[in-house]
């Protein structure tokens, strides 16, 4: 969820199983050409399904379940994205959320909606019995969740 230039998508594609696919979502239409260029050059274009639009509208329409979900998008919607995907993640599946420490802003009184949402997300996943969670304090913070 959140493609930007597609670097993370390509890295994830390198670890796919033989018949695996990746669905990637971004709402920035201006980045589609850049993403396509990199996906073609990488050799993984045929296993990557690009979706353009708001993730909250696209996720319900993607078929199947997920082994891994990487969230690196609009911080305000991290709690919503978790709610939309959690029941579709396979047992033992992994959810990775980037930027969860938000330059240390989550440790202070929140002054913006993104920080409030990340604080809410961090509490939500910490207290959710469906997942085991750990925050890795590298760079801007990375949450790893494993579905029980």
Describe each PLM feature range.
Residues 1-148:
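S-adenosylmethionine/decaboxylated-SAM
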């Amino acid at each position: 969820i959140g493609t930007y230039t597609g670097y993370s998508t390509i890295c994830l594609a390198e670890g796919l199983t033989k018949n695996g696919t990746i669905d990637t979502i971004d709402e920035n239409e201006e980045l589609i050409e850049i993403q396509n260029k990199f996906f073609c050059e990488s050799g993984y274009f045929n296993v990557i399904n690009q979706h353009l639009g708001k993730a909250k509208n696209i996720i319900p329409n993607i078929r199947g379940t997920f082994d891994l979900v990487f969230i690196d998008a609009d911080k305000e919607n991290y709690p919503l994205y978790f709610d939309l995907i959690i029941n579709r993640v396979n047992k033992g599946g992994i959810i990775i959320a980037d930027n969860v420490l938000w330059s240390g802003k989550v440790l202070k009184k929140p002054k913006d909606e993104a920080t409030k949402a990340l604080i809410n997300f961090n509490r939500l996943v910490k207290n959710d019995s469906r997942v085991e969670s750990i925050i890795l304090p590298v760079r801007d913070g990375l949450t790893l969740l494993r579905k029980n």
